[in-house]
Amino acid sequence: MKTPTGPGTAAPRRGSRRIVDVAILTGALLALVAATLAARWAWTPAPGPEEQVSCAPYGLEDVSTAPRGGARPLSTGPVLSGGLRWAEGTSDRLDVTFEHDGTTSSYHVFADGIDWSEPVGVVFRLHGDGAYEYEHPEHKVSCLAEVARSHNAVLVAPRTPDRQGEPTWWEDLDGNAEWFLALAEQRIFAEYDLDRSRTWLHGYSGGAEFISYELLADRADFLQGGGAVLSGGGGAPSTGTSQPTDEQLEQLVLHWDVGLEDDGTDPYAPFDALSAAAAGHAWYEDAGWARTSVRYREGVDHFELPEARVLDAAMTAGESPGERSAELSPAASTEPPRGAAADGRD
């Protein structure tokens, strides 16, 4: 396995002195990214109830969908194994509170349009720093939910329980992972009749870092099938305690997606996601994960990734193991950034 040697490449561990350095070096950078995201998207008015959201900004040129979550409705209840709790069918559930071991946060579940007579998968969407998309699910998250629905999967979008400054997933890896896994086991898998062999993690920026540094590195047994999509980040952990099975190593889809312009030189996006993605992909490939892939996108920065299209391609690849996805393959004209596998950061 490769151990990145560049500054900040190792994952911060709770209780480690390195977390202080990591917080100083990266906190301001990712906070600026989060502020930029909010500034860039805040001008976009929320769509009305009769309007359709175009998914073209997220890679699906011909797809529009109803906005999800603008009115913050609660559903009639989740689906339990063996039947429904209160009503004939389910709908979206927003801002549902969940507490575990003294830690409280909330989550959305997007379940409109699911066929519960067939196997149902799940996509866990992990937001970037600042949690903007959690607070405004009527845009990108609506398109991601539509992709999940097209594969008969619900989309779950939790908000990090972090309340110290800018909300992040990666600053308290262990604590946030404990809350997230408890949410998944005690609420999502317990209340909904889901096929665990179709479980997906989908993270953007700081959410991608959380997946690569913690969920895959130390808690891979959570994924019994499906895989992970890491957009705009996903660096290499310093160590990993997970002991994946041969089946996991052979079948789980792990895909990194990043723009070639997402190298930290943009003052509005100082996080070097390009190096992080290259380092993370190399680490997991060297660790024996057979279905890893990375796509470096020309002319694309931290804010322009076709996340909905990539999620669709990854889920399709998971359903068709024998087929190679052109969307997930490196473009013929692009190559990994020179030296990036050793220069990622937290």
Predicted regions and their residues:
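N-terminal Sec-pathway targeting helices
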Residues: 12-28
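Primarily recognizes the serine-hydrolase "nucleophile elbow" in alpha/beta-hydrolase
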Residues: 191, 197-249
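The feature captures the conserved acid-bearing segment of alpha/beta-hydrolase catalytic domains
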Residues: 226-315
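Catalytic active-site module of serine/aspartate enzymes centered on a nucleophile-bearing elbow/loop
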Residues: 309-340, 344-345
